[in-house]
Structures are given as structure tokens and as C-alpha cells.
Regions:
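A short His-aromatic
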Residues: 51-55
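Short conserved loop adjoining the S-adenosyl-L-methionine
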Residues: 36-41, 57
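C-terminal lobe and adjacent flexible extensions of AdoMet/dcAdoMet transferase-like proteins
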Residues: 140-146
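A conserved beta-strand element that flanks and buttresses the S-adenosyl-L-methionine
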Residues: 48
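A short glycine-rich, Lys/Arg-flanked "PGG" loop and its adjoining helix->strand segment in the class I
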Residues: 60-75
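Local beta-strand N-terminus motif with an aromatic residue
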Residues: 44-45
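Class I SAM-dependent methyltransferase SAM/SAH-binding core
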Residues: 1-36
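C-terminal alpha-helical "lid/dimerization" subdomain adjacent to the S-adenosyl-L-methionine
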Residues: 2-4, 16, 76-139
Length: 146
């Protein structure tokens, strides 16, 4: 849906996925091997990673590779600050994604995401917080190397 909204506003959208399945007839993602995104450095103005990182075991590599091909990153994830929030987030995510592949639930607290961005030498330009169904969500806006 986000891609459709962006295309209606004349943005060029290039979906990327590790699976060849189409989301609908208007979207055909570029398939990649989960390691090397098949585009040159800084090929895109903005990359959006929308609630996908907690479904992976190699977040650092994915973010690094996305930062390589994009001048700016927008990352949205579910975060937690207590054990109760952590397990509630895992439960809700498992329910919402029950028909998809198993999820390793590699969600992080806000502080851990920020530490990872610092480690990857990314500039944190803005942060937005919201709650949805009791789950804390965050959007990070990042620019390439400091």
C-alpha cells in the first residue's frame, strides 16, 4: 500500500525482497539473496525498511547494505522497554504474521537500535514514537556515514 501511495505521488518505487512472490499485480519486487543488494552505491535517495528487521537474524548486515545503496534510510520497528512489553510484542507479531515464515523476534529496545546505528556510523536525523494496540513503534530517519 505504501508503494502505491508513493507511486501516485510520482515517486519511483523499487520494492526489494528475498522472495519472488508478488504482493499484487502492480508490484514485482527485485529479488536479492539477503546479503548483497543488486544496486550500485547510493543508487536511491531513500530506502524504507518497514517492520522487517525483527524478522531477520542479520540486522546489522541488512542495514549496512541498505545504507550503501541509499542516501537516507527510514526504519520502522516495534520496540520494547520492559520484559512484559517484549513478550506482548512477540505475541502480537506472531499472531499478525501467522501465515508467514517463522519469525526470530529480533526486536530491540530503542537504546539498542540507536547503539547499532552509531556502530554503523549512521546519523540519526529524527525519531518518531507511537503506540499501536499497546505496542511501541518507532520510526528512525538516518543518513549515511557521519
Amino acid at each position: 500500500m505504501l508503494g502505491e501511495v508513493l507511486r501516485e505521488r510520482n515517486y519511483i518505487v523499487t520494492p526489494l525482497d528475498i522472495h519472488a512472490g508478488q504482493y499484487d499485480d502492480s508490484v514485482t519486487p527485485v529479488i536479492y539473496n539477503g546479503q548483497k543488494i543488486p544496486f550500485a552505491d547510493k543508487s536511491f535517495d531513500t530506502g524504507i525498511l518497514l517492520t522487517i528487521l525483527h524478522h531477520t537474524n542479520n540486522q546489522e548486515e541488512i542495514i549496512s547494505e541498505a545504507a550503501r545503496v541509499c542516501r537516507q534510510l527510514i526504519i520502522m520497528e516495534d520496540i520494547y522497554s520492559t520484559q512484559l512489553q517484549k513478550y506482548y510484542t512477540f505475541f502480537l507479531d506472531s499472531f499478525v504474521n501467522m501465515f508467514y515464515s517463522p519469525c526470530p523476534h529480533t526486536n530491540r529496545p530503542d537504546k539498542d537500535w540507536k547503539n547499532l546505528f552509531f556502530k554503523l556510523n549512521l546519523n540519526l536525523e529524527a525519531v518518531y514514537y507511537k503506540k499501536l494496540l499497546g505496542v511501541k513503534q518507532v520510526v528512525y530517519v538516518l543518513k549515511g556515514e557521519k
